[in-house]
Amino acid sequence: MTKIKQEIYNKRPTSPHLTIYKPQISSTLSILHRMTGVALFFVVSILVWWLILSKYDNNYLQLASCCIIKICLVAFSYSWCYHLCNGIRHLFWDIGYGFSIKAVNITGWCVVVCSILLTMLLWV
């Protein structure tokens, strides 16, 4: 690189890096919505397989009493409740409601709280 090209290259503005970017509730929930969608696909497949096997062998059914399996089932139910609540939020966005910054933040926190409450309701 010539000296002039190097000087021009050094004076170019740089974009902010992810380390200085403050995550917003909307971006965090968007990423989490995608992750739970993929996770639910695989977990439901495993759950159906487990239920089919438990029909033929009671040992698989006894796994449900294991503490680790219960924790996984609670995590699965939270993921399902979160994905459901955030999906409803997206349906409202599809019809044009809730696009202001304030509404996005409020509905984002409502999704988090409602999914926790629904999960607790399922397990109590």
From Swiss-Prot:
<comment type="pathway">
    <text>Carbohydrate metabolism; tricarboxylic acid cycle.</text>
</comment>
<protein>
    <recommendedName>
        <fullName>Succinate dehydrogenase cytochrome b556 subunit</fullName>
    </recommendedName>
</protein>
<keyword id="KW-0408">Iron</keyword>
<dbReference type="InterPro" id="IPR018495">
    <property type="entry name" value="Succ_DH_cyt_bsu_CS"/>
</dbReference>
<feature type="topological domain" description="Cytoplasmic">
    <location>
        <begin position="89"/>
        <end position="103"/>
    </location>
</feature>
<dbReference type="GO" id="GO:0046872">
    <property type="term" value="F:metal ion binding"/>
</dbReference>
<feature type="topological domain" description="Periplasmic">
    <location>
        <begin position="56"/>
        <end position="67"/>
    </location>
</feature>
<feature type="binding site" description="axial binding residue">
    <location>
        <position position="83"/>
    </location>
    <ligand>
        <name>heme</name>
    </ligand>
</feature>
<dbReference type="GO" id="GO:0006099">
    <property type="term" value="P:tricarboxylic acid cycle"/>
</dbReference>
<keyword id="KW-1133">Transmembrane helix</keyword>
<dbReference type="GO" id="GO:0009055">
    <property type="term" value="F:electron transfer activity"/>
</dbReference>
<dbReference type="InterPro" id="IPR014314">
    <property type="entry name" value="Succ_DH_cytb556"/>
</dbReference>
<dbReference type="InterPro" id="IPR034804">
    <property type="entry name" value="SQR/QFR_C/D"/>
</dbReference>
<comment type="similarity">
    <text>Belongs to the cytochrome b560 family.</text>
</comment>
<dbReference type="Pfam" id="PF01127">
    <property type="entry name" value="Sdh_cyt"/>
</dbReference>
<comment type="subunit">
    <text>Part of an enzyme complex containing four subunits: a flavoprotein, an iron-sulfur protein, plus two membrane-anchoring proteins, SdhC and SdhD. The complex can form homotrimers.</text>
</comment>
<keyword id="KW-0997">Cell inner membrane</keyword>
<keyword id="KW-0349">Heme</keyword>
<keyword id="KW-0472">Membrane</keyword>
<keyword id="KW-1003">Cell membrane</keyword>
<feature type="transmembrane region" description="Helical">
    <location>
        <begin position="30"/>
        <end position="55"/>
    </location>
</feature>
<comment type="function">
    <text>Membrane-anchoring subunit of succinate dehydrogenase (SDH).</text>
</comment>
<dbReference type="InterPro" id="IPR000701">
    <property type="entry name" value="SuccDH_FuR_B_TM-su"/>
</dbReference>
<keyword id="KW-0813">Transport</keyword>
<feature type="transmembrane region" description="Helical">
    <location>
        <begin position="104"/>
        <end position="124"/>
    </location>
</feature>
<dbReference type="GO" id="GO:0005886">
    <property type="term" value="C:plasma membrane"/>
</dbReference>
<feature type="topological domain" description="Cytoplasmic">
    <location>
        <begin position="1"/>
        <end position="29"/>
    </location>
</feature>
<keyword id="KW-0479">Metal-binding</keyword>
<keyword id="KW-0812">Transmembrane</keyword>
<keyword id="KW-0249">Electron transport</keyword>
<feature type="transmembrane region" description="Helical">
    <location>
        <begin position="68"/>
        <end position="88"/>
    </location>
</feature>
<keyword id="KW-0816">Tricarboxylic acid cycle</keyword>
